[in-house]
Amino acid sequence: MTAEAPPLGELEAIRPYPARTGPKGSLVYKLITTTDHKMIGIMYCVACISFFFIGGLLALLMRTELAAPGLQFLSNEQFNQLFTMHGTIMLLFYATPIVFGFANLVLPLQIGAPDVAFPRLNAFSFWLFVFGATIGAAGFITPGGAADFGWTAYTPLTDAIHSPGAGGDLWIMGLIVAGLGTILGAVNMITTVVCMRAPGMTMFRMPIFTWNIMVTSILILIAFPLLTAALFGLAADRHLGAHIYDAANGGVLLWQHLFWFFGHPEVYIIALPFFGIVSEIFPVFSRKPIFGYTTLVYATLSIAALSVAVWAHHMFATGAVLLPFFSFMTYLIAVPTGIKFFNWIGTMWKGQLTFETPMLFSVGFMVTFLLGGLTGVLLASPPLDFHVTDSYFVVAHFHYVLFGTIVFATFAGIYFWFPKMTGRLLDERLGKLHFWLTFIGFHTTFLVQHWLGDEGMPRRYADYLPTDGFQGLNVVSTIGAFILGASMFPFVWNVFKSWRYGEVVTVDDPWGYGNSLEWATSCPPPRHNFTELPRIRSERPAFELHYPHMVERLRAEAHVGRHHDEPAMVTSS
């Protein structure tokens, strides 16, 4: 007998199946007991995207309600619950924890560490977030319904008289528990970055994403304990009659100061990591090193420092804050953000650009975030802010900066690192469909809301009069919202299909031009990430490993410092 080998062209890589499947329930047991940072990162991402879908569903209900005046298929109370829980879920149960999803997936790999510094604390942080978020959202199944005082929880709306019932209490306790998980996660990330970098990985050789996670974690340690303390005070007011936020002693403004001193650093806590994600993606698809690495780091540090000095721009309309100071500081924080834009543009400038899905989402992030940033500069001016505060103009502004940053960069990161985590590539055609539906749906929904706010439509209203003239733009906005909702279908199908049947990745770096260390190990990485580490001589160790013939040229062309092989430049006067 002779055996005939198949032609080489017919052979394709397949993922080998395990010798046998484990006993029933073994996967659940593994998920509950795991301390592997990669597994925990995937669990964070799945949980956060699930909450993102729930928050989006609440938003669709609100947009449907506002499509026409007098519709009232939701009661006013239900509408209040929806906008409260929508804001809470999106900001605190999706945006903040998914930061730790990406940090867990990528950060130990980027610094050449076998795991995070405290693996069990890492798992504990995740479960605190899951249970805290579940407690916070559980108000929907109580007789009085969920919390209905807005995600900012302004007093006296949150006191026992105006918001009786379990929904508000569950909201407060859920945020305390989830916030504790966030604080512990930040402690873990700072320790990991400081103590577990590979030999040769100096601070200024760390990837930008790692820098941003470290700075974000420091901000979390500044902001979140304050929120926890403020929430405990609110619970004491509701149950013990503590009178901390009593209007009679100025407590209403005290709550606003405490909340926004958390709230403004919070928006940078959920922006900086996503700046880091796109800063990892632009160089790879531009075939160039990041432009202005050091400047990017200092811009990140500047944003973090300034973010704790602008909180009262949320309070211009109270008349109780120093307008010139907070206005000036808000203008000032736009400067380092603008510097980042020039870094990203400089990275793409004259690069060999290709527009795979991660790059598309990153460019979508830049366009959307730029528009949101410009309306932010408008709102930094108190005379303008007085006119549009608490209107749909503000709603449009913060959705542009938050959706533009978090959602576009989340999807960019998922498409970028999915092959590293699973060993399979996501489908490019579905990815591009997902991007264009998201981009068109988002801008259709929120661009018109600037004009609605300018015409005087207040936020958080469940209805409006036919004579107000708001219906046309609201219909456009609602249509956009449903397009945005539909954009999630190709994404979910893509992840489900590719997880099981996607093209298998057979190389360490499927994109071909990866810079940081995660592209110097297998897809997916082994349990402790690396079997061997390349030498780290710059901020691009994986690129230098895969393109050793480029190293000398990269050193020669790097416009930093003086080259020792050239004579010193002599200047004559």
UniProtKB/Swiss-Prot annotation:
Domain of life from the UniProt record: Bacteria
GO cellular component terms, semicolon-separated: plasma membrane
Residues at which heme a3 binds: H397
List of residues that carry N-acetylthreonine: T2
Main location group: membrane
Residues that bind Cu cation: H264, Y268, H313, H314
Amino-acid positions noted as binding Fe(II)-heme a in the UniProt annotation, renumbered to this chain: H86, H399
NCBIfam families per the UniProt record, alphabetical: CtaD_CoxA (TIGR02891)
Family: Belongs to the heme-copper respiratory oxidase family.
Identification of the protein by name: Probable cytochrome c oxidase subunit 1
Organism: Mycobacterium tuberculosis (strain ATCC 25618 / H37Rv)
